[in-house]
Amino acid sequence: MRKLTYLIPILAAAVLVSSASALTKPKKIAFVGNYSGQATTLVNGSTVTITAKGNGSGTMIGAGALNAQGTGDSSQQPCVPFGGTGTLTGASGTIYFKTNAGASGCGDEGGHNFTVKAYLAITKATGKLAKAKGTLRAVGTYNRDDGSFQVKLTATLTK
């Protein structure tokens, strides 16, 4: 009986140590990406269909492409709310995202140059960022006259 009394605390300690090592903290990854390219907007009534295609690079996925599509509501001025989905694809992986509520493109008085701000929730990631979670902060510009856009993406992802 005495041996059993000593064995129980030792077993309990072993279980606690193995459980603690299995519960490691998520790894934090600072993500920065810069992309530029062409965007098209097709207006039908107050609905704007948006397509964006560009090139650039992002942390851990490398050089590659941005592809996104969505819709906006041009009846709300000067800041047009929009939403959609897209991908950031590089040699070392792909990030799939969807736009969170609150994204907008705010135009100048003539509706030519827009400042774009959005938060993009990662829905899936592959390659070096497989299983990464987080939200990308997107800040950029869009020129409606020539279709050009530039966007900087930043985030602290967890994996």
PLM feature spans:
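Beta-strand-enriched cores of mature, soluble protein domains
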Residues: L23-K159
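C-terminal juxtamembrane segment of a hydrophobic transmembrane alpha-helix
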Residues: S18-S21
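Bacterial N-terminal signal peptides
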Residues: I8-L16
